[in-house]
């Protein structure tokens, strides 16, 4: 496992018990809106199988199961996050439609074309090769299915970007310090992590690697004054 992956393991293991309570802090309390918009992008009828990667505590998986009676394989590499998710799923009464899977996005334990749609959240900043990871996600997606993600974004406007920097570098670490050492570390890490990712992979480059991974009709929607983004694409013939 690479140092990037080991760091992600340590980071999320420390915040798993309080992730659903504190998580909105990291997204300006916009994460629920981003999840709903991402789910609206996938083409999955009731009874479909959807793979949710980097599922964490199951926020996306539960929304899928609740809103569309979809069956979900919720995959994450972190056992602590999956355990917290299993507890939350039981409390929510998921009706047995969510199956937790321990695994890595780069080596999915599923056959080709196993899923009608694939979603992922806050994933590509934590992998060594985003394009190869997208190829692997596309491998398990059926032809014609949709791959969709939500991720943090760096606002473009100078005033909004200045506010974003102040929030990520000052406000989040201060609140995280009040919560726990693990949350303080996570809050300090997030802003620089997002900025570094977008410096290396600006949006046109992200679109390019999605297309190079075999996804077509790639669409983007920037949300919440530029703080979040949803990207989606379809697997199949680019002319259709």
Feature locations, PLM:
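A short acidic, Gly/Pro-enriched loop at the edge of an enzyme's catalytic core
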Residues: 106-117
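A short SAM/SAH-binding and catalytic strip from SAM-dependent methyltransferases
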Residues: 117-130
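Conserved beta-strand signature within the Rossmann-like core of class I S-adenosyl-L-methionine
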Residues: 145-152
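Class I SAM-dependent methyltransferase SAM/SAH-binding core
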Residues: 49-107
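A short glycine-rich, Lys/Arg-flanked "PGG" loop and its adjoining helix->strand segment in the class I
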Residues: 131-143
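Conserved alpha-helix/loop element of class I SAM-dependent methyltransferases that forms part
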Residues: 28-46
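Core SAM-dependent methyltransferase catalytic element
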Residues: 213-240
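C-terminal alpha-helical "lid/dimerization" subdomain adjacent to the S-adenosyl-L-methionine
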Residues: 6-7, 154-209, 213, 219
């Amino acid at each position: 496992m690479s140092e990037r992956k080991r760091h992600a393991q340590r980071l999320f293991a420390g915040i798993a018990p309080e992730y659903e309570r504190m998580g909105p802090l990291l997204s300006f309390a916009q994460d629920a809106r981003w999840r709903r918009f991402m789910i609206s992008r996938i083409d999955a009828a009731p009874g479909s199988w959807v793979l949710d990667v980097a599922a964490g505590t199951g926020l996306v998986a539960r929304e899928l199961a609740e809103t569309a009676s979809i069956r979900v394989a919720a995959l994450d590499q972190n056992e602590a996050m999956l355990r917290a998710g299993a507890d939350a799923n039981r409390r929510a009464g998921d009706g047995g439609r969510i199956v937790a899977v321990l695994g890595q996005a780069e080596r999915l334990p599923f056959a080709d074309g196993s899923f009608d749609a694939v979603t992922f959240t806050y994933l590509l900043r934590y992998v060594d090769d985003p394009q190869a990871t997208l190829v692997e996600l596309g491998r398990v997606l059926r032809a014609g299915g949709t791959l969709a993600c939500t991720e943090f974004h760096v606002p473009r406007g100078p005033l909004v970007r200045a506010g974003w920097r102040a929030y990520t570098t000052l406000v989040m670490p201060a609140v995280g310090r009040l919560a726990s050492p693990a949350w303080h570390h996570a809050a300090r890490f997030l802003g620089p992590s997002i900025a570094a990712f977008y410096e290396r992979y600006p949006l046109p480059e992200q679109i390019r690697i999605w297309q190079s991974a075999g996804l077509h009709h790639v669409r983007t929607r920037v949300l919440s004054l530029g703080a979040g983004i949803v990207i989606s694409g379809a697997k199949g013939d680019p002319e259709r």
